[in-house]
């Protein structure tokens, strides 16, 4: 009898041990699976606007100029795209949404779906191919392929688009449907234009800038930057709310110092260091060229409201860092353009052509500068010259 009880006790103990080990193994397996299936998504991009005299964003043609993208990128004007208009360069809006890119990180291959809504704008460029472009962009089903050795598209030009690939993100593959080929990239890329309220108002009066946060959330970091005749300077404002008046920056600092503080803001907002470096490398030539501009990190709530993002399955981590870029038209810029406008009726064709080219060196920004000059110009002859330029078609849509 005692032996029977002893055997029963031993048997129960063994059962408990085995059961415990089994439960522990299942938990370890679930934890490992969860870790392997963990999806991390990071995004960066830029909203570019131009401040009017009252601080409100001007209406302009953001795509008026030569394209800065590789030829394989899909556009709404391209026959490969899903929509077609005569000339996307004639689109007018307050804001240019530039190069949002979505990065994906996972330890194993995953199938996901991604859709970005843009209720107050339209998508103008994207890659890889999308399923639809109705009130935003929908890529449909995608495959995340960590470690895959894809031959990524290239047109062998020196283009800032490629800098966004310099991260550890997993390649993304869009399977071809309806005769469209399979396409892959290190990210999902999209651009667009829209008219919507941004939180920061910027107004220049002589050498004083008035900045106003019109939103309900603090703006984590604001950087006022100026490059005038090759000399640069900047000011930093952290945790900004309400209103502040600031002098234009003293031009006694170098661009590398500005980049350091901007990079710190990007990383503090959640981007990986390689992502922040890729963003700065992408936009360095444009962000720090001649001119006065204000950079700021958009509050996340505004990003989500402007660009609602739906990813299935839901990521374990989602970081979205959109940088606002407000261009400020300075008196020096207006004077330089006005000088060239005065040459447009010169008897010499060579002088007129040189003046036209000088004005167009401002690229997509020449039209807003002319509009501001027109507001104050009293000379009817000069006004007529400016109006002729403003009424002309876009320089290039592609």
Regions flagged by a language model, labelled:
Residues 1-6:
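Positively charged n-region of N-terminal signal peptides that target proteins for export
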Residues 27-343, 350, 361, 365-375, ...:
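Protease-labile, long low-complexity intrinsically disordered regions enriched in Pro/Ser/Thr
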Residues 8-20:
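Hydrophobic membrane-insertion alpha-helices, especially the h-region
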Residues 20-26:
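Juxtamembrane cytosolic interface motif at the C-terminal end of transmembrane helices
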Residues 17-20, 345, 376-378:
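Helix-centric, low-specificity signal for extended rod-like, repetitive segments
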